[in-house]
């Protein structure tokens, strides 16, 4: 019988904190500047300069810790992580080792269904070990100079929050679900812009396998700097296959650091994996211990936004939307704000139709144009009026879609755009019973065959008659009334 393998995954995520200046200097953190134009004497490790801790970076770490229910260390220390690399000017990185600022905590994830594997969607809680503050290194540019490597120190000293999980994830799907949940949270909190292309949010995956039922962990490989959710999933799946095949062929997994090649969709060895003692951590003598009083924590707490989970439950309770819909609507702070702005104008009675529109037509248009909800050309007030016109029977849902597209394309700024377009194009729904009866009589007379088929028991013929009636009114008839009148006349 073939061995059944269990996958063990832990993630280390580097979230670049959204401060204007670096963690230990006043140099700018702006992305995209000319190489080495945003590196000051502290970043360059010139003699005689000392680091000064950025208060904003600490407050962002506290905010994150409060959001995940962790313990904020009343006293934490910075350490020197010693290693040599050309883009590390000091010969060490300032980080935290023994006492991190954020200790423990957890994040609840929603793992989607996998129909191919026959797995239903489920919820899981991932425990965090810690989150600590550290500085980023510079960047080595290997492709810009023939036969040489360029060094750009603009990134050196940029504040990072390294967030470390327990090795509790058991599949690439769980790892991706966690990474997405974490990404959404740090962006929601405003502590990180989440731009993965610019390296603001990147993951290292520690992957190992072991026989099902074995308690001892297998030898792990660390896959570095995965900067997209797709790469994270592909890299983990490849690494799992590689390790299982290696063991089953009689080989041994070596503890090492690996890189993912997205073109070949495979991981490759980078270097042997170091342990903590290889870095010779010791307290940084240039930095005092970081002391965080309860009053500081309370000040940060008072400025915290409503968290996604709490808002999701509120949407279910207040607006009567499903838990799934509430989860989609709170997937970003901007989406949630837009939804609430629409409901505030359209009324709570229209909350469900507002949710359906945001997840349907609005989302598809956003995807079509490649823009985010905060750049939507249709204001919340404009959409609210449109939904009110559906609710009061002025227009049908089909006509509303046409009006929405018109407002979107013309980038209308007037709040009453929906009413203006309805009047200008004569789009009001025909709800007059007498007028509809006359139209339906004409449709029945012109479609005698469909009438016979319906009376013979063919339900499709009824739908064909509805279609003809809607066609005769150019889509402006009230569909419900058409349905009722047809049934009445057909007996």
UniProtKB/Swiss-Prot annotation:
EC assignment: 6.3.5.-
Tree of life domain: Bacteria
GO MF annotation: an example: asparaginyl-tRNA synthase (glutamine-hydrolyzing) activity
This protein's UniProt keywords: ATP-binding, Ligase, Nucleotide-binding, Protein biosynthesis
Keyword ATP-binding: yes
InterPro entries documented for this protein: Asn/Gln-tRNA_amidoTrfase_suB/E (IPR017959), Asn/Gln-tRNA_Trfase_suB/E_cat (IPR006075), Asn/Gln_amidotransferase (IPR018027), Asn/Gln_tRNA_amidoTrase-B-like (IPR003789), GatB (IPR004413), GatB_C_1 (IPR042114), GatB_Yqey_C_2 (IPR023168), Gln-tRNA_amidoTrfase_suB_CS (IPR017958)
Reaction catalysed by this enzyme: L-glutamyl-tRNA(Gln) + L-glutamine + ATP + H2O = L-glutaminyl-tRNA(Gln) + L-glutamate + ADP + phosphate + H(+); L-aspartyl-tRNA(Asn) + L-glutamine + ATP + H2O = L-asparaginyl-tRNA(Asn) + L-glutamate + ADP + phosphate + 2 H(+)
One Pfam assignment: GatB_N
GO biological process, one term: translation
PROSITE patterns cross-referenced by the UniProt entry: GATB (PS01234)
SMART domains, A to Z: GatB_Yqey
SUPFAM superfamilies assigned: GatB/YqeY motif (SSF89095), Glutamine synthetase/guanido kinase (SSF55931)
Matching Gene3D superfamilies: 1.10.10.410, GatB domain, N-terminal subdomain
Keyword match Ligase: yes
NCBIfam families for this protein: gatB, PRK05477.1-2, PRK05477.1-4, PRK05477.1-5
UniProt record similarity statement: Belongs to the GatB/GatE family. GatB subfamily.
Subunit annotation: Heterotrimer of A, B and C subunits.
Described purpose of this protein according to its UniProt entry: Allows the formation of correctly charged Asn-tRNA(Asn) or Gln-tRNA(Gln) through the transamidation of misacylated Asp-tRNA(Asn) or Glu-tRNA(Gln) in organisms which lack either or both of asparaginyl-tRNA or glutaminyl-tRNA synthetases. The reaction takes place in the presence of glutamine and ATP through an activated phospho-Asp-tRNA(Asn) or phospho-Glu-tRNA(Gln).
Name of this chain's protein: Aspartyl/glutamyl-tRNA(Asn/Gln) amidotransferase subunit B
Protein species of origin: Burkholderia cenocepacia (strain ATCC BAA-245 / DSM 16553 / LMG 16656 / NCTC 13227 / J2315 / CF5610)
Organism ancestry: Bacteria, Pseudomonadati, Pseudomonadota, Betaproteobacteria, Burkholderiales
Protein's gene: gatB
């Amino acid at each position: 019988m073939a061995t059944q393998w269990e996958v063990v995954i832990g993630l280390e995520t580097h979230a670049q904190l959204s401060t204007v200046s670096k963690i230990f200097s006043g140099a700018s953190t702006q992305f995209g500047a000319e190489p080495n134009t945003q590196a000051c004497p502290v970043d360059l490790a010139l003699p005689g300069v000392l680091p000064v801790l950025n208060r904003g970076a600490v407050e962002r770490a506290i905010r994150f810790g409060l959001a995940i229910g962790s313990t904020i260390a009343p006293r934490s220390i910075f350490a020197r992580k010693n290693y040599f690399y050309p883009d590390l000017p000091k010969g060490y990185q300032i980080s935290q080792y023994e006492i991190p600022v954020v200790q423990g905590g957890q994040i609840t994830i929603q793992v989607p269904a996998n129909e191919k594997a026959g797995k239903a969607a489920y919820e899981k809680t991932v425990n965090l070990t810690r989150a600590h503050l550290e500085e980023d290194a510079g960047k080595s540019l290997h492709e810009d100079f023939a036969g040489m490597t360029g060094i750009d120190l603009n990134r050196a000293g940029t504040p990072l929050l390294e967030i470390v999980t327990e090795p509790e994830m058991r599949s690439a799907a769980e790892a991706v679900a966690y990474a997405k949940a974490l990404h959404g949270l740090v962006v929601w909190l405003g502590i990180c812009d989440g731009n993965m292309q610019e390296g603001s949010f990147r993951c290292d995956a520690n992957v190992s396998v072991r026989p099902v039922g074995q308690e001892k962990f297998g030898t792990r490989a660390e896959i570095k700097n995965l900067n997209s959710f797709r790469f994270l999933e592909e890299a983990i799946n490849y690494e799992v296959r590689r390790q299982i095949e290696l063991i089953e062929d009689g080989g041994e997994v070596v503890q090492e650091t690996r890189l993912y090649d997205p073109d070949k969709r495979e991981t490759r060895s980078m270097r042997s994996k170091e342990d903590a003692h290889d870095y010779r951590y010791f307290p940084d003598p240039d930095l005092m211990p970081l002391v965080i009083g309860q009053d500081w924590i309370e000040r940060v707490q008072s400025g915290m936004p409503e968290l996604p989970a709490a808002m999701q439950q509120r949407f279910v309770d207040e607006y009567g939307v499903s838990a799934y819909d509430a989860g989609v609507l709170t997937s970003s702070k901007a989406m949630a704000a837009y939804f609430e702005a629409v409901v505030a104008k359209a009324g709570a009675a229209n909350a469900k139709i507002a949710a359906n529109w945001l997840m349907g037509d609005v989302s598809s248009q956003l995807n079509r144009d490649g823009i985010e909800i905060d750049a939507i050309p249709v204001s919340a007030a404009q959409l609210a009026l449109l939904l009110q016109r559906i609710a009061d029977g002025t227009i049908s849902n089909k006509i509303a879609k046409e009006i929405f597209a018109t407002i979107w394309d013309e980038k209308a700024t007037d709040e009453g755009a929906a009413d203006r377009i309805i009047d200008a194009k004569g789009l009001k729904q025909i709800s007059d019973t007498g007028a509809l009866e006359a139209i339906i009589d004409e449709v029945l007379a012109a479609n005698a065959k469909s009438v016979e088929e319906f009376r013979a028991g063919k339900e499709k013929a009824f739908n064909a008659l509805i279609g003809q009636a809607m066609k005769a009114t150019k889509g402006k008839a009230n569909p419900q009334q058409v349905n009722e009148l047809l049934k009445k006349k057909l007996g």
